[in-house]
Amino acid sequence: MKRLILLIAIITGAATSAWAVELNIDDFFVYNIMTHHDVTAVQVKGKELKQYKLSSFRSITINNNAKLAKTALRYIVKDAKLASQKEEGTKSGRLLYGFYVFKSGNDKNRYLFFRLNNPDADVVTDITVVDMEGKATFDELKQMFK
């Protein structure tokens, strides 16, 4: 019986997200959104990221789609509440960009970065979201995005 319980625990653990911390924005990195005509998506894993102390990188840029941009921003605002470290920029009470760090139980952190690409528009239609995992520090990643 103990073996069965252990096997179920292992299978369940393997079936969960590969990311160190699960976030609401994960729902945005699904095939039907990433292949939408208003979305440009990038995913990178492996040796290319080693020099940046990252193990995973994925991003989506939404252009000219208020519904998708608003949904992404709503998820980001929810996730920001879970961040252990954050930096945000606002203008007239409007969130323009955010950089968030999420600590995990293992030696990797998860990082979420976003910015509005049309900050002066009345309606948010363009947004970029970058989701990363690795051992880089908050300051190292901020330097990469300057």
Tell me what each language-model feature is.
Residues 133-135:
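Short, well-ordered, aromatic-rich surface patches in folded extracellular/luminal domains
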Residues 1-25:
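Bacterial Sec-dependent N-terminal signal peptides
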Residues 19-109, 117-123, 137-139, 143-146:
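Polybasic/polar functional segments that serve as interface/processing modules
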